[in-house]
Structure formats: structure tokens, C-alpha cells
Amino acid sequence: KRQVYGITKTPIDKANEQTKKEAYQAVFADASGFNQQEYDADAADKMVADAGYDDTIDDVEQAIDKDGNALGYVITVTAKDGSQGSITFSVGIKNDGTVNGYSITDISETPGLGMKAEEEDFYSQFENKTVDKFTVVKQKPASDDQIEAITGSTITSKAMANGCNAAIYYFCLLYTSDAADDLIGV
């Protein structure tokens, strides 16, 4: 058993790293690189929880252009309130607070329902929006902060919106709060 684990661990780790890199690039297509940011995961999770989100902040990367200028951040979140368990995804947020979108790295929702969170009809609703938070609605959205739920999968829709909201909240703390130094480990 241990020998099989040793043989498969390195390829699995490499595949996971590649999946992350692809997710980062998907939410920051104009970035030429990403710098991992040190942050206090426990402090970040507590602040997000204190704001009412049952999500965790798993990683923070700074997106940079070819000259090394900061474009924004990629914040990887695990939403724990999906209908079939946790959903892990990366959210790209520009320096001005505009959400570029999200890219899912781990999901096991119901095929034909919750899995539609990976489809453009749903995820495109989050792209290029500057909002304080997203709200899920069952009808056509009337404003930028509204996301039309996936038919038959309101739980997954809300999990995705809440995860994006947790990332937005954390991003705002990085820029607008005295707590920023604690959050990023400065």
C-alpha cells in the first residue's frame, strides 16, 4: 500500500499543480505569471466566517504582467455548502475590484444539475463584474450583482456565489482594512 502511494504521489501532486496553474490563467488571461502570497489561513478563514461565509481561503496568488506589475489577485476558495459537498475554485479579482470570473478545480456535484456551474451560461454571469457581493435569483438578473440560479440546482448556485463573495470580502480586507497586515502575513 505504502509503495503504491509513493509511486502515485508525485504524479498526482504535479497534476494538481497543473490544474491550479490552468485555473489561475483562466481567471487572469493577461497575466504572465503568479506570485504565491504568504497569508495567515486561520486568520483569513476566521474573518470570512465572521462575515457569515462557510468557506475557506486556500491560496492567494498575485497576478503579474510581463514587467512584474501587479494586476490583481487569484484567491482560491473552498465552498463547503455545495449540494454534494465541497467545491474548490479560484476567483480572479483585478486591483480595482473587478471580478474576472472563476475557474473550478474540484467539484463533484450532480451531473446535469450542479455540474452546470462549470458551463459558460452560468460562470459567465460572474465575469467582469464590480460588486460588493453576488445574490442568487431565480429569474433573469436585474442588476450586475444578481446571478440567475442553475435550474434545479439552487444550492450549487448559492455555494458558487457565496464562495465568490468570500473571495471578494477577503480581497476588500486586503486593501481597505487595518487587518490586511495580519491577513497576508506582513
Where are these regions (language model features)?
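Internal alpha-helical transmembrane segments
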Residues: K1-P11
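Conserved small/polar residues in nucleotide/adenosyl-binding loops
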Residues: Y175-A180
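Structured beta-strand/loop patches that form or line metal/cofactor-binding pockets in enzymes
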Residues: I57-F89
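Flexible, solvent-exposed short loops/turns enriched in glycine
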Residues: K80-S86, N95-S153
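Short extracytoplasmic/periplasmic juxtamembrane "stem" segments immediately C-terminal to an N-terminal membrane anchor
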Residues: T10-D30
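C-terminal binding/interaction regions
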Residues: S153-S157, N162, Y169
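Short extracytoplasmic
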Residues: A23-D50
